Design a protein with these regions (language model features):
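Short pre-active-site segment immediately N-terminal to the catalytic Zn-binding motif
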Residues: 269-274, 324-345
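Long, K/E/R/D-enriched contiguous segments that form extended
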Residues: 250-290, 297, 319, 353, ...
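Helical catalytic core of nucleic-acid polymerases
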Residues: 354-403
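C-terminal, non-catalytic "cap/extension" segments appended to globular domains
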Residues: 91, 97-109, 202, 220, ...
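Active-site recognition of the HExxH zinc-binding catalytic motif
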Residues: 207, 335-357, 376, 381, ...
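Catalytic zinc-binding patch centered on the HExxH motif and its immediate surroundings
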Residues: 206, 270-272, 306-327
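A well-structured
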Residues: 1-267, 551-555
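A sensor for short, sequence-defined functional sites
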Residues: 72, 76, 80, 90, ...
């Protein structure tokens, strides 16, 4: 690629340009493969020194490679419009990648400046974020259950936040925040640096209008669309407050505590073995599409699932789609709780999405962030329908529907309020506010979110330092709200149209990252700039609550 630099002129013939673009693509593929190997190894055990050393060395190598190839991006961004459009027209599957480079043109710096930023990230903020992961992954938690004190990982502890016993739920949350609060000075300082780094680069150097505007531009979403989504979510906080009032009556509580919002309605939660969970998820996909189920099976056939919790293992769950043609890798922490089954369905949905887009270049393979949750949330809904279809007991059906609403709250309103907090946090840190002031602001936002429907305990003011997305990917979480409300609309169409819906759904997934979210969804008849579209998702949620209100309260 460097050898061809002298050929990069505004009048370069299209075949020569495409040959250089192909080399650029090969470099990107090798970089992704190496980076993925290091991250997957690190995820197995975040305390593994060999994995840490490899990741650190690779970071340096990949930054150096990125900096050597940086001239290509900058040259293309700097072309006159007519010359750039001529090359875009001949670029085939890479078209949207090149259009995206042009979209970022106003926010791009000179080549020496971009090199400095890449080096700064690798040795600065990226290292700090890795430090956050290392610190939090080694936390252990002590919880007394039935007279026995258990030593737990965070994922194991969180299972007790859905325990049938109110005192166990409360103790689990209190222990979570006790440990994080004890480390809050360090964790909040890391977040402070994350915000200041973002502000320095995105506002002072690149001149985005607002901190969130940088993420919106990367997502190819206008600020106005994201603001509309967030304000519609905010104005519908009462929908979930209504649900929490209903759930309090079901649990025979005068008022729901924040400890109780994910409480099961039954005193004995059903447990699942991993094999049983896999069978259920695959069966739900098979009922929808044999092709989709076949893609999901590849993850298991190729042993690309790491499901067992263990000390040092990265918490949570993710799916890593590395390259077109490679079966994605999935990490979960399966503890046998009912919630772990839809988590598996969710991550398999991501894997299916990646495999559906395998015909694309590595440069246009990954779905844009706003659409990245489409197949994952859709997979959860397919699983719910399967479980409801197999269950005739009205009490169990009610519990399943309540579980859906619990998860919908967690995916829609909770995530929207996370982003609303981030918007404020970036402003407050820029104004020099303290950690305690940030925590107080977060707690006040929780009060707005829950209203008078939920009693808040003081320790929840520290919830924000537990949210890894704030550290890893600022302003990420509205994508969950976007994805869930979008899927509610798509799933309504699937129920109405049956098999006729499949080609349209497949097309959305098969686009990968080869077109803008607005373009992909417009082909499905969806206008993401219309507040009525987002309100329609809340109307579906409200209708589900109405259905539940018509059921008898469990005795």
């Amino acid at each position: 690629l460097v050898a061809g630099r002298s050929r990069l002129t505004p009048d370069i013939p299209a075949p020569e340009f495409l040959s250089l673009l192909e080399t650029y693509e090969r470099i990107a593929a090798i970089s992704r493969r190496l980076g993925a190997y290091a991250y997957l190894w690190f995820s197995e055990d975040t305390q593994n020194q060999a994995a840490l050393n490899l990741q650190g060395r690779l970071d340096q190598v990949l930054v150096a490679a990125h900096n050597r190839a940086l001239f290509f991006d900058l040259w293309f961004k700097g072309l006159p419009d007519e010359a750039a459009q001529r090359l875009i027209e001949s670029s085939g599957d890479e078209r949207y990648f090149l259009e995206s480079l042009r979209r970022l043109r106003p926010f791009t710096l000179s080549e020496p400046e971009e090199r400095v930023i890449a080096l700064k990230d690798a040795n600065g903020i990226d290292a700090l974020v890795n430090l956050y992961d290392m610190l939090t992954s080694q936390y252990s938690f002590a919880l007394q259950v039935e007279g026995e004190t258990k030593t737990l990982t965070q994922d194991e502890l969180m299972a007790y936040c859905r325990h049938p016993a109110p005192e166990v739920r409360a103790a689990a949350y209190q222990e979570l925040y006790r440990v994080y609060r004890a480390n809050s000075t360090v964790l909040a300082q890391i977040y402070n640096h994350r915000v200041r780094d973002w502000h320095a680069e995105m506002l002072e150097l690149r001149h985005f209008a607002e901190p969130i505007s940088a993420r919106n531009t990367m997502n190819d979403l206008p600020d106005a669309v994201v603001n509309t989504l967030l304000e519609v979510c905010r104005s519908n906080a009462g929908v979930f407050q209504r649900y929490f009032g209903l759930k309090a009556r079901w649990l025979n509580l005068g008022k729901l505590r924040r400890y109780d919002i994910y409480a099961p309605l039954s005193p004995s939660e059903k447990r699942y073995g991993l094999d049983e969970a896999v069978d259920l998820v695959l069966a739900s996909l098979e009922d929808f599409s044999r092709e989709v189920a076949g893609l999901a099976r590849r993850v298991f056939d190729e042993q690309h699932l790491d499901a067992t919790p263990r000390p040092g293992k990265r918490g949570g769950a993710y799916c890593y789609g590395v390259l077109p043609g490679l079966t994605p890798w999935i990490l979960t922490n399966f503890t046998g709780r009912a919630r772990d089954v839809p988590t598996l369905a969710h991550e398999l949905g991501h894997a299916v999405h990646a495999m559906m887009a395998a015909d694309h270049s590595v440069l246009t393979y990954n779905a844009p962030l706003p659409l990245a949750e489409t197949a994952s949330v859709f997979g959860e809904m397919l699983l719910t329908d399967l479980l409801l279809g197999r269950e005739s007991d009205p009490t169990v059906r009610r519990e399943l529907l309540a579980s859906v609403l619990d998860d919908t709250y967690a995916t829609v309103l909770r995530q929207a309020y996370f982003t609303l907090f981030e918007r404020d946090a970036h402003r407050l840190i820029d104004e020099g506010k303290t950690i305690e002031e940030l925590a107080s602001h977060y707690f006040a936002a929780l009060g707005e979110q829950f209203g008078s429907a939920v009693e808040l305990s003081d320790e929840f003011r520290w919830e924000w330092i537990v949210v890894p997305h704030f550290y890893h990917t600022p302003f990420y979480t509205y994508a969950y709200s976007f994805g869930q409300l979008l899927v509610l609309a798509l799933y309504q169409r699937y129920r109405a149209e049956g098999e006729a819906f499949l080609p349209r759904y497949r097309k959305i997934l098969a686009y990968g990252g080869s077109a803008s979210p607005a373009h992909i969804l417009a082909e499905a008849g969806i206008d993401i700039g219309d507040p009525g579209f987002w309100q329609g998702g809340f109307d579906v949620i409200s209708g589900l609550i109405t259905d539940l209100e018509g059921l008898e309260v469990p005795s």
